[in-house]
UniProtKB/Swiss-Prot annotation:
Region entry Domain II, spans: 66-144
Complex formation: Homotetramer. Forms an RuvA(8)-RuvB(12)-Holliday junction (HJ) complex. HJ DNA is sandwiched between 2 RuvA tetramers; dsDNA enters through RuvA and exits via RuvB. An RuvB hexamer assembles on each DNA strand where it exits the tetramer. Each RuvB hexamer is contacted by two RuvA subunits (via domain III) on 2 adjacent RuvB subunits; this complex drives branch migration. In the full resolvosome a probable DNA-RuvA(4)-RuvB(12)-RuvC(2) complex forms which resolves the HJ.
The keyword Manganese is annotated on this UniProt entry: no
Region annotation (Domain III) ranges: 150-200
Encoding gene, per UniProt annotation: ruvA
Region described as Domain I: 1-65
Protein purpose: The RuvA-RuvB-RuvC complex processes Holliday junction (HJ) DNA during genetic recombination and DNA repair, while the RuvA-RuvB complex plays an important role in the rescue of blocked DNA replication forks via replication fork reversal (RFR). RuvA specifically binds to HJ cruciform DNA, conferring on it an open structure. The RuvB hexamer acts as an ATP-dependent pump, pulling dsDNA into and through the RuvAB complex. HJ branch migration allows RuvC to scan DNA until it finds its consensus sequence, where it cleaves and resolves the cruciform DNA.
Cysteine disulfide partners in this protein: none
Species assigned in the record: Chlamydia trachomatis serovar L2 (strain ATCC VR-902B / DSM 19102 / 434/Bu)
Gene3D superfamilies: 5' to 3' exonuclease, C-terminal subdomain, DNA helicase RuvA subunit, C-terminal domain, Nucleic acid-binding proteins
Protein name, UniProt field: Holliday junction branch migration complex subunit RuvA
GO molecular function: ATP binding; four-way junction DNA binding; four-way junction helicase activity
Homology family: Belongs to the RuvA family.
Biological process terms in GO annotation: DNA recombination; DNA repair
Entry superkingdom: Bacteria
């Protein structure tokens, strides 16, 4: 079983990416949301958390931007009637924080709007999600999927500020990385943020 795959992003297709690591190309299925974020990292080193689905005729890897997102996916596919594709569709429509909010408010209609999920399935899913999803939130506060070479406090503060504005952790990392390249690693967060926002 793989925990994560770290390597060079060499190919992006409609529903998957290829990560080359030690001469092996791994095809990894991703949500559309994650695919969009990864486009800025073409031919760069990335780290993707993975979940393996092994069947008689195929071995499929599903990729996620964080351990928390992967554990949420595993929780979703543990429910009867929800397979990997539907689980990925849920995460594509609702980031983990939003999914927690939906579960807390028991918004069955939101879950039922996901293709492949009916009202009855959504109602059953909501009961367990409300109880189990909050336990995953501590995992959400982990390092970005694409570690930056810049580790100064301004960089980290900038990422936090961008995430508070609604950007994903990966997008915030990309925007701040580009801002640092344009200025310098010694630049303050006040100097970096305006430039980072122009990179969105």
């Amino acid at each position: 079983m793989y925990e994560y795959i770290k390597g060079t992003l060499t190919h992006i297709d409609g529903s998957y990416v290829v990560i080359e690591s030690f001469g092996i190309g791994y095809a990894i299925m991703l949500s559309e949301r994650f695919l969009v974020d990864l486009r800025a990292f073409m031919h760069q080193e990335v780290l993707i958390y993975v979940h393996s689905v092994i069947r008689e005729t195929e071995h499929v890897l599903y990729g996620f931007s964080s351990r928390a997102e992967r554990e949420c996916f595993r929780l979703l596919i543990s429910f009867s009637g929800i397979g990997p594709k539907t689980g990925l569709s849920i995460l594509n429509m609702f980031p983990l924080q939003e999914l927690c909010s939906i579960a807390r408010l028991e918004n069955v209609k939101a879950i039922a709007s996901v293709p492949g999920i009916g009202k009855k399935t959504a109602e059953k899913l909501m009961v367990d999600l409300k109880q189990k999803l909050p336990t995953l939130m501590p995992l959400y506060l982990e390092e970005p999927v694409v570690p930056s070479s810049t580790a100064n406090s301004s960089f980290k503060e900038g990422i936090g500020a961008l995430m508070n504005l609604g950007f994903s952790r990966l997008a915030a990392d990309r925007m701040m990385t580009e801002a640092v390249k344009e200025l310098s690693e010694e630049a303050s967060v006040a100097e970096l943020l305006p430039i980072a926002l122009r990179k969105s």
